[in-house]
Amino acid sequence: VTEQRWNLVADIGGTNARFAALREGQLESEFEFYHSVEEYPQFSDLIIKLRDEIALATGFVGAPHSVCLAVACPADVEHISFTNSHWEFTKTHLLEWFDCQELVVINDFEAVAHGITELGADDCIKIGGGEPQAHKPVGILGAGTGLGMAALISHSDGYHVLDTEGGHADFAPVGQRQMDVLTCLRQNFKRVSLERVLSGKGIVNIYNAICQMEGTDPTLTTPPDVVTAALANSNPQALTALDTFCESMGAAAGNLALTLGARGGIYIAGGVVPRFSEFFVNSGFREKFEDKGRFASYLEPIPVYLVTRNNLGLLGAAKKLQNN
């Protein structure tokens, strides 16, 4: 049994809650814990179970010294309410529940951005472009239960993370098929944000729209169903849907690169795209990324990296504590 200071980091999305118990100063841990959000009516129910789990697995005694939670919703408020799940809590309650000395709550994509700074060459697949320019902005977007966006801005002390809610900007269709998809989605949603298209659920939304456009009944109901059918080439609507997803991601990534002047590169993170990374690399993603008329030549040299490393959010949350 070790009487040493330890920290707890978490990456809490709409579907999964991931935790790691770290010795102080560590960025990575062999002690990781995974839970499904829907299994727990309240976050506090999970904390009770987590305490026992951590004590049993690690031998760490007592409360964590520092806790960093990366959450899939705006984090700079006292009352945390998740965009894509039923969980909510206050920072005051968190301090009570964890009994920690330091509590940091950040947006999940701010954590991803911190994690990007620790990636090695083996953690990414490069999709076109040249070399990243030093000290230029880096754009990050990633599809999971929702769509996250963030940026890394270089400054004299290292870098600053710009966390955003860019995933809730309007979906801007490119080409007739995307316009038709938007028309279909408008029948179901008062407003169609990027997240309605570029997320796990977004893949199903696109698939349902394609079925409606082609006059066929949708038979697939979950993101893995659609992806599996597309990769097996067993369902033409699923294949069209995944193509449309990749092209829409390319257009959105190109828009982000233009908006930020992201000559330091664009990173595609999140849990969705790595499930079909080979398909994504060979899709129309890069073509749509560069397809910006007079500014195609601006985008051509910008590299895009598909992040293949697991648990980037946990790494980033640990990095945030280290930076503090």
Where are the language model's segments positioned?
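Short glycine-aspartate micro-motif
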Residues: 7-11, 66-68, 104, 138-142, ...
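ATP-binding/phosphotransfer module of carbohydrate and carboxylate kinases, centering on a glycine-rich
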Residues: 1-55, 59, 63, 180-324
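Short amphipathic alpha-helical segments
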Residues: 21-22, 48, 80-82, 117-118, ...
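Active-site nucleophile and cofactor-binding loops and adjacent substrate-binding regions
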Residues: 37, 82-85, 104-111, 130-133, ...
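Glycine-rich phosphate-binding loop of actin/hexokinase-like ATP-binding domains
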Residues: 126-194, 278, 284-290, 294-296
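Short beta-strand-loop/turn "lid" adjacent to the catalytic site in phosphate-handling enzymes
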Residues: 57-105, 113-123, 140, 275-278
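Short, acidic Gly/Pro/Ser/Thr-rich loop/turn segments
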Residues: 17, 74-76, 146-150, 205, ...
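ATP-dependent carbohydrate kinase catalytic cores
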Residues: 102-133, 224-236, 243-246, 251
